[in-house]
UniProtKB/Swiss-Prot annotation:
GO biological process entries: antibiotic biosynthetic process
NADP listed as a keyword: yes
Domain of life from the UniProt record: Bacteria
Naturally occurring in which organism (per UniProt): Streptomyces violaceoruber
Pathways involved: Antibiotic biosynthesis; granaticin biosynthesis
Active site: 104 (proton donor)
Signal peptide: none
Protein family (similarity comment): Belongs to the Gfo/Idh/MocA family.
E.C. number(s) listed in UniProt: 1.1.1.384
Residues binding substrate, per UniProt: 26, 243, 263
Protein name as catalogued: dTDP-3,4-didehydro-2,6-dideoxy-alpha-D-glucose 3-reductase
Statement: the UniProt record of this protein carries the keyword rRNA processing: no
One GO MF term attached to the UniProt entry: oxidoreductase activity
Pfam name, any one: GFO_IDH_MocA_C3
């Protein structure tokens, strides 16, 4: 390369498999706005839905997901389908040679997650799970404060994510689509616990409120602990509650508290409360579009995979380990749970 020459990197061409709300409201706008990605096609079982989305974002409309995977102008596929469809369509996309960004949770079971991660690694492809909040700059601020000893030694986390009931036909109430509060909502505080407390957490107990008519859990709680340090996490989640979306991290010398912790609007400025014996401080953090940040991280992972960086040219071993660990925690909550039938 000649001195002064700047290499042009082609934008990652994205195909979107489905017209879910999060795709239309957050991810397609982020793909379109990012200099790193370009939405090239939107697929739906309904040609009408596909056309409407495609017209909005200036890309091709495709009827059916198989047709999307056959397109040569698609480098990577974003999958916002119901949870039960994540594993089969992720596998098909990987076998078609596409990188995959799948909505959380990647699958409903750890065994399926492990199998897909292995497939991605074998083929040198990126397989990512779309927890947007982990890309928000607020968590960089939190880590910096904890590392600086702002609250002393970390002792415990309490976190909740709860929402009011949805309409009766909402897919969260469909057992055949792997609905339920744990997979749709509880996964957020579980992922948060690993993010803030590390990868050694174990599930020590859980309760799930199980709707026997619809066959899904409507809410629950879980207790996690690190067997080496004794650090613990108390998590509450559900979809029959008043809205909450916050957490408190307790240390030996103070605490940190954050509300609207999982899905803040792009323009929202988070308020991080720092409580110590000498007083309370509220820091107003910068607004940050976590969807745009997630898209940039995915595009960078694909770029690095193309250059041969990371384990076996695919998703780095650390990222894959975090995805698998999350799936194992979800399985462990199910296995440990006392079911309250309602």
């Amino acid at each position: 390369m000649n001195a002064g020459h700047t290499e042009t990197v082609r934008a990652l061409r994205i195909g979107v498999a489905g017209c879910a709300d999060i795709a239309l409201r957050r991810m397609l706008p982020a793909f379109a706005a990012s200099p790193h990605t370009e939405p090239t096609a939107v697929a739906s079982r309904s040609s009408e839905k596909a056309r409407a989305a495609a017209e909005t974002f200036g890309c091709a409309a495709v009827e059916g997901y198989d047709a999307l995977l056959e397109r040569r102008d698609v480098d990577a596929v974003y999958i916002p389908l119901p949870v039960a469809l994540h594993a089969p369509w992720t596998e098909r996309a990987l076998r078609a040679g596409k990188h995959v960004l799948a909505e959380k949770p990647l699958t409903a079971r750890a065994a399926d997650t492990a199998r897909l991660l292995d497939l991605a690694r074998e083929r040198g492809l990126v397989l990512a799970e779309n927890y947007l909040f982990v890309h928000h700059s607020a968590y960089t601020a939190v880590r910096d404060l904890v590392d600086a000893g702002a609250i002393g030694d970390v002792r415990a986390l309490s976190a909740s994510f709860t929402i009011p009931p949805r309409s009766a036909d909402d897919i969260r109430y469909r057992a055949d689509l792997d609905g339920g509060a744990l997979l749709d909502i509880g996964v957020y505080p579980l992922r948060l616990a690993s993010l803030l407390l590390g990868s050694e957490l174990r599930v020590r107990g859980a309760v799930l409120r199980h709707d026997t008519v619809r066959g899904v859990d409507l809410g629950g709680s879980a207790l996690l602990g690190d067997p080496g340090t004794g650090v613990s996490a108390q998590l509450v989640f559900g979809m029959e509650h008043a809205y909450t979306a916050g957490w408190r991290l307790l240390g030996s010398e103070g605490s940190l508290t954050l509300d609207r912790a999982y899905s803040p609007p792009a323009g929202h400025r988070p308020v991080l409360r720092i409580e110590r014996p000498d007083g309370t401080e509220e820091r107003i953090l910068p607004a940050h579009d976590q969807a745009t940040a997630a898209v940039a991280a995915f595009a960078e992972a694909v770029r690095r995979a193309g250059q041969g960086a990371g384990q076996d040219k695919g998703r780095s071993s650390g990222d894959a380990a975090a995805v698998l660990r999350q799936a194992e925690l979800v399985d462990a909550v199910r296995q440990a749970a006392h079911l309250v039938k309602i």
